[in-house]
Structures are given as structure tokens and as C-alpha cells.
Swiss-Prot record:
It catalyses: uridine(516) in 16S rRNA = pseudouridine(516) in 16S rRNA. One of its GO terms (molecular function) is 16S rRNA pseudouridine(516) synthase activity. This is Ribosomal small subunit pseudouridine synthase A. Its EC number is 5.4.99.19. Residues 1-67 form the S4 RNA-binding domain. Coiled coil: none annotated.
Length: 233
């Protein structure tokens, strides 16, 4: 691929803008400054601009540790969008593969691959999602059984699919809940149906993809190939 085409793809630049960037002398290929757009680059080449390594633009698969106070949308008139936490080009092409409420923290997956995200969000695939939940009131002795049978959500005709709950810390009213669907505010509504209230909610896992323990709130990384492939299994 020509270097100017590579820059257009990697930076979302026009051909004219790519030419201007090259003339600035801020682009290196394998640590050598290159000003010609005709230079050929391959997958083995290391291309940098202003000291930042650029990648050949293919589908992107991102894991974000969403902090509280950010919404999963491109625009919101009242809250920060989680996209401001990303340092990426062509942001308008990215979307969330499953959202979290503004006050919910944890794992969010972001991509520009619609087929991949559909595999996660489509109800027919029943993608597992695991949440750490802190409740306002003590954990009922019958909660696990009722959730495993399915509960009746307000304004819903059907029971929820069977969910798995385990107690993490009874003194702190802390549980882990795994669900297999993604209804609006589902976890909060499930515990409301049991007469309790969710005080704090944190998503730890989507399918086989677990939130990286090394990430701090607001940080992100690209998924490994194994994590990407796990969605199709």
C-alpha cells in the first residue's frame, strides 16, 4: 500500500491532508523520515506520526472500563459520552456492542464491525453478561431460586430467561448475576421485581470476554484475537 493511502486510512485524512502531513517531516517508516506518498508500506512496517505508531485500518475491537457519569452514545446533552475517553480516529464509525447506564461502571465493548456486535446484542444469541451488584437491602434466601426460574418485569409479558446468582458478600449485600439477554435496565428491574433496589452496578464480563484487571476506570485496550474470535463460538 502507498504511504499516502495508508495515512488516509489510519488518520481519516484526505489525500491532500496526507500530502501535507508527509511534507511536515513528522512521518517515519521503520524509524526513517519519509516525505513521499509513493513509498510502499507493508504489514511488517512500523509507521509513526508525531511519535505515535499508526496501524493499518481494519475492524477495531476495543475494551473500555467505563467510569460512572459517562453515557454510551455519540452525543448527550447532559452527560459526558464515553467516546471522549478514546484516542481514536474515525470515531463516527465506532459504536457500542451493548450499552451501560450512566451510573453503571465496568466492561464496555466498542467496534466498527456491525456483524460482530450483532452477535453480542442480538436476543437470539443469548450472550451471557455478568454483573457485580450491590443491593440496598439484605439478600433474600429465595433470590437465587427465583432468578433461576425467571422473574416478571414490570410492563413485560414474558418472564426473564433463567439467570444465575451467587452471593459474594452477604454483609455488603453483594452478589454476582449472570443474565442471558439485554432488556432495558434489566438487572435493576429484576431486583426491583424481588422487592429490592440496586445501589451499585458493575459489569465484569460479556460472553467469554472479561474486563482486564490492569485497566483503570477510563482506560481501554484493543481486544486480543482470542477475545475477538470468542464471540463467534
Amino acid at each position: 500500500m502507498r504511504l499516502d493511502k495508508f495515512l488516509c486510512d489510519a488518520l481519516g485524512a484526505t489525500r491532500k491532508e496526507a500530502t501535507k502531513i508527509l511534507k511536515s517531516g513528522e512521518v517515519t517508516v521503520n524509524e526513517q523520515v519519509q516525505k513521499s506518498g509513493a513509498v510502499k508500506v507493508t504489514e511488517e512496517c512500523v509507521v509513526e506520526w508525531q511519535g505515535r505508531e499508526l496501524a493499518m485500518q481494519g475492524p477495531r475491537y476495543i475494551m473500555l472500563y467505563k467510569p460512572e457519569g459517562f453515557v454510551c452514545s455519540h452525543e448527550d446533552g447532559f452527560n459526558h459520552t464515553a467516546f471522549v475517553l478514546l484516542d481514536e480516529v474515525k470515531m463516527d464509525e465506532l459504536h457500542f456492542a451493548g450499552r451501560l447506564d450512566v451510573d453503571t461502571t465496568g466492561l464496555v465493548l466498542i467496534t466498527d464491525d456491525g456483524k460482530w456486535s450483532h452477535r453480542i446484542t442480538s436476543p437470539k444469541h443469548k450472550c451471557d453478561k455478568t454483573y457485580r451488584v450491590w443491593l440496598a437491602d439484605p439478600i433474600g434466601s429465595d433470590y437465587a431460586e427465583k432468578l433461576a426460574e425467571g422473574v416478571q418485569l414490570r410492563n413485560e409479558k414474558e418472564l426473564t430467561l433463567p439467570a444465575q446468582m451467587t452471593i459474594v458478600n452477604a454483609d455488603e449485600n453483594e452478589v454476582l448475576l449472570t443474565i442471558h439477554e439485554g432488556k432495558y435496565h434489566q438487572v435493576k428491574r429484576m431486583f426491583a421485581a424481588l422487592g429490592n433496589k440496586v445501589e451499585q452496578l458493575h459489569r465484569e464480563r460479556i460472553g467469554a470476554i472479561e474486563l482486564d484487571e490492569s485497566l483503570e476506570p477510563g482506560e481501554y485496550r484493543y481486544l486480543t484475537q482470542e477475545e475477538i474470535d470468542s464471540v463467534w463460538k
